[in-house]
Amino acid sequence: MLMADRCLLYYITDRSQFRGDEPARRRALLAKIAEAASVGVDYIQLREKDLSARELEMLAGDALAAVRKSTPLRTEDRELRTRLLINSRTDVALAAGADGVHLRSDDIAPHEVRHVLEASAHRPSATDHFLVAASCHTAADAFRAESEKADFAVFAPVFGKRGLAGTPPAGLAALREACRAKIRVLALGGVTAENASLCLEAGAAGIAAIRLFQENKIEDVARALRAL
C-alpha cells in the first residue's frame, strides 16, 4: 500500500453527458477541465473514445491549454499542476504533449509503453516524467500494474457502475486487497462524497470519477474529499 499525503483526485471526462450539439458539449467539457485545474484536481483523463486519433489530439491540445491557463504555476512547479492523461492512446498522448496515458486492462502493458517512448519522435524530455496509469479490477491486476511499472492504478468498480445493469460491484474487501500493492491505487465506480471515506479507509490513495466531478461544482467536491 502506498498512501498519498492527501486524497488524490482524478476527473475522467465524458462530454456526451453535456447538453447541446457537439460544439456546445466541447465548450462545456473544456470549461469543466479548466474548473478542475483551477481547484487543483491532480489528474484528468481525457476519455472520449468516439473520437478519431486526429480529433482526440486536437481536443487534447485544447484541454492542455485550458489546464495551463487555469494553473498559473512557475515552470519548476510542473509536478504540482493538474496532469492530463489520454485514455488508451499512447500515440495521441505523445503527439499532443499530454502528461501521460491511462491504459485499459486490454491495452499494452505499462512497461511496453516505456519502449514506445524510447522509439517515439515525440518522447518527453528527460525532465518530464510520462505518467502511465493502469485500470485494474482485481488485486492480481493491481500487483501486475506494480510489477509492470505503472505509476498508479485505478481499481473499479468499487460500488458498481451507475446506470449499467449487470455490472456487480467489486466491493471494499476487493479494493482493500488491491491496495496492498506498492503503488497508489485510486477507487472508481459508484463513488460519492458520502461513501468516499470508505474507500480511503480501505487504503485507496484517492478517488476517480466521472459524474461526481461533472455533475457538481468541482471546488465543493474537492473540498469535501480532501477534508476526509
Predicted segment positions?
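C-terminal binding/interaction regions
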Residues: I207
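Conserved N-terminal beta1-alpha1 strand-loop-helix module at the mouth
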Residues: M1-P72, D77-E118, D128-F152, T167, ...
